[in-house]
């Protein structure tokens, strides 16, 4: 993949998304005008990634929770630079080491608006004595926003 500044990013190893871990990451080789470097790039649930970061901004929790409470889906993004290593070592690089001492890069906020009639349908079901259950992989606060 090429970036706007001429850098070329190549995925070297992928640590697959796992619903228990609530994150996924890649080891990527970045070639730019400065040379070639290795980085771990990671995305995942903000409450999970926070535990793997060196530091987080003072308002980290308040920021992502504010969006979640209003129904948004939030992912945290982080990275770290990795020392150069040969291809065999890159492929053997353990996930536990890759996903440690991360640097916070930001949040991705995705708004998924409800259909116009969602609240009315939920109310109608409840008033008809139906027990309504919600099954979701979203943050519990996002689900609470929906009702």
Predicted regions and their residues:
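Cytosolic catalytic regions of ATP/NTP-dependent phosphoryl-transfer enzymes
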Residues: 1-104, 110, 119, 123-128, ...
